[in-house]
Structure formats: C-alpha cells, structure tokens
Amino acid sequence: MRKFIIRNGNVCDGISDNIVKADVLVENGRIKDIAPDINSEDTIIFDASDRIVAPGFIDAHSHSELRKLTYPENRTKIMQGVTTEVDGHCGISSNCFAFDNDVFKWNSFAEYLELLKQCRPSTNSVFIVGHNDLRRSIMGGKPSVASDDEIKAMQKTFRELLEAGAAGFSSGLTYFPGKFADTREMQAIASILKGTEKIYTSHIRSEGDDLLNALDEALAIAEAGNGRFQFSHMKTMFQRNWHKLDAMLEKIDSAQKKGLDITADRYPYIYSATGLHQILPAPFDKNEKISDFLKESEENRKEVENALKNSPRDLKSTILINYNKTLGELAAEQNVSAEHVAMQCLMENNLQRAAYLAMSDANLQKIIDLPYVAAGSDGISSQLDNENDFVHPRAAGTFPLFFRMAAKTSGIADAIRKMTSLPAQIYRIPERGVLRKDYFADIVIFDADNFNSQAGFDGRNQFPSGIDKVFVNGRLAYDHTDPQNIGRHGEYIPIC
C-alpha cells in the first residue's frame, strides 16, 4: 500500500485551531496533498466520514526501548494512535550502552539500532541518553560524586551519542546511581548540549517535599546546557505538597521570561508508578541492593521494617503492580502490618514495581491545561494478554484520557496539538507531528466522541475504544476491523 486517499475526514493538522473537511492523499510514505475532493487513479480509498484525521500521536515520555525488541507489535501504544515514542527518560537508556541479558546482547548503540531494525517495531523511535546508564558505563554503581576524569569520560561518550542521533540528555535523580551525582556533574554533562537544539529532560531530584529546590537545580542544569528544559511528568507529590504547584509555576514563568525554553509532559493519572524501593526512608534509600541487605539477617529485616513506619509514602494505599493489590490489602490477608509486607517484597525482588496514590486531581487538570505540557505516558509497551504482565493503566490509557481532559478545557484542536506538534517541536523531530504536504504520513483516524480509555488497576487494563486506523510512514499499522494484525513499519528517527 504505497498510495491511498483518506476521504472526507475532519482534518486537524496538529498545529492550527481549525478542523476542516478534506481528503488526504498519501504516496510513498509521505503526504502529497490535503484538499477537498482529491481525485487520483488506481488509489485505495479509506472513508473517514465523521472521524477526526490527525497526525499520529507522539508519546513525549516513554520507556519502551527494550520492550520494542521483545514485543515489537507494541499494541498498547499503536492502538492508542501513537506512531512515535521518545524513549530514554528518567536517566534510563540501557539501549545506548553495552547490554547483555538472557535474551539480547549488544555492545554499542549502533548494534542496538541494528537489532531494532531487525525486530521491526510498529512505532517510530526517538532516543534520549539517560544519565544513570551513562554514569554506570563509566563509574559502575559507585555511590560517590564523579571525579574530573570521570566527568570528562561521560562528556566524551555523551557527545558521541548525540552525534549518532540521540535527541538529548535525561536524568532521574531519585534513582541509582544518578542520586549520587551533584549539580556540578550534571551541569558539566549538560554543557555538551551547547550549540545544539537538543534538550535536557529530568525526573527531578524531588517531586514532593523539596520540589522547589529540585526545580531550581534542574533549571540551573538546563542553563548550563542550551537553556532548554523538559520537566518530566510534572507533578506535586503527597498532599502536604499540593499547594506548591502555584509557586512551582511561578518559578517556571520567571525562567521563561528570562529566556529559558521550558516545556513539560504529563500522564492523566494521580497514581505514579516506579520501583517499590522508593518507599525506603534514609539511610536505606541509598542502598541499591536492599534485597541482599534484607537477606543477610533478621536484625536487618527488623531495622528496615521499623524504618518503613517513617516512609515518605502512604504504604497502605500503595499498589503492588504484580499482585494488583495494595500493601494494605495484602497485609490484611496475612494479618501482618503493611510495613512487614513491604519489607518481604523488597527482600524478594529489588525491582518490584509499585503504584503510589500521591497526587491531586485538581493539580492534574491544571497541569494538563498548561499550553506547554505534552502528553507523555511514562509507560512501557505491554502484551496485556499475559496475566503476569501487569502494568500501570497509563501504558494503554494515557492518550484517550489526556485527550478528553485537554479537550474539555481548550478544545479538540489544542488537545491534538499537545499530542502531536508540541512533542515534535520539543524534541526537534523533523517532518512529523503535523499534517502537511511532503511530511511523513504518520496518521490516526479516530472517533472523538468515543475515544475512551478502558484501562485500570482492577485487571481491566484493556485497549482504548475509538481508534479506527493508524498509519506509520504511510503504511497501515492498525485497523479496528482486524485488531490482531499489527503492521510493523516503525523506524529509528535520528535527531541531527
């Protein structure tokens, strides 16, 4: 299918406020014309009457770099209308460095890209270099600040990855080993961004009690680069910090007026999801191998269990994603404390995943309404049909929910802008995110009235309704009349 017409759709180009009735002609992977009543011989016709025709959605914050190899169909994203994912956030980008597990092995970013090409994922890929893996490639898991020589080595590696097409630099300063980095280290690495249009993105050092100081640090790091900052999953964690949103936005507004280019992404949920180790208070939050520590002695287990009484998180409402139950529910079933269940889970698995109820509905809507906030799932691709593959519902529900929340305030066209041209502009993704002549034909056809999430923590983590068809690089990737047949036409998009 190299030539086709999408007929009689309500075309929203992703950048303007207008939605117009028109046809879209696609040939050889690119948009050739957008106009009423296009005629072309020997052309397949797709009827889009009463449907929105929009640019394929761009997931501004994704973590699918490894799952694309094991699960290239990527149904959780393609069936939401996502055609491009920006991976490598929160300092996590093992694809950019030597990697070896039971399934895959590569020695460089170039080897990973060759493997990705062989796997043929359904979505396009843009990659960011993650600080945690960059640091680990030079320093291992060393729990200390970097030396001058180590910083120079990280700078050299980072520069090479930018030259290979990486879109920027990400950090996750609450995670290992990034949490051991000081601001000086981060600024030195970010300085390699100078002279490029590439961005610094961050899961900042604190999203709760020390939020405002953490934002100051992030802005200082961005300023040491090229003055561009993407605030990852912008939020205010824990009820005691919800009131800080206005002060946070004032800081951002002030920095923007001084010339910094600040944008953000957000998923439309008040539950976050990350490792269960995030419940650990000091000093145990510095121990990357907490599982081994707990296995060493009963004394260690009691010490951690007692410390968990001072956890910064609400343990009883914390959902263990692999069990699809809260710590409180599991504690009641076992007639023990939530702290005891949490300690046992940490002992069993350093990588236990959890979801935390810590955010405000009102703040969520206010953040999504900001003109510079793009849709970002913070999710991985998932099979969903695997009973052991539990994920946060944002993996399958972000885009329909974000669309509904954004459209409620600013209308359909602006909601689509935040899911298409805005993330394309943030990451400097060329010739995508807008329906325009000669641009790549990444296109979604959907029913705006019935575009709804069906994902939840209750086991109903299902695909959304309302998506009719998705095209990636001018080829059909998803058709709702044949949902099992996923076209795998995604490509790596280097950012120059």
Model-assigned labels for residue ranges:
Residues 90-97, 101-224:
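Hydrophobic, small-residue-rich alpha-helical packing segments that form membrane-like cores
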Residues 184-191, 199-226, 362-418, 423-425, ...:
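Extended hydrophobic/aromatic segments used for targeting, binding, or gating
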Residues 12-23, 328, 353-364, 412-416, ...:
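Acidic, glycine-enriched loop/beta-strand segments at the rims
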Residues 116, 122-133, 137-148, 154-175, ...:
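Active-site neighborhoods of metal-dependent hydrolases
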Residues 292-297, 366-372, 377-380, 390-393, ...:
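C-terminal cap of metal-dependent C-N hydrolases
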Residues 48-107, 111:
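Metal-associated gating/positioning segment near the N- to mid-region
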Residues 1-5, 10-56, 71, 453:
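Histidine-rich, glycine-flanked metal-binding segment
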Residues 9, 24, 29, 50, ...:
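Divalent metal-coordination and catalytic microenvironments
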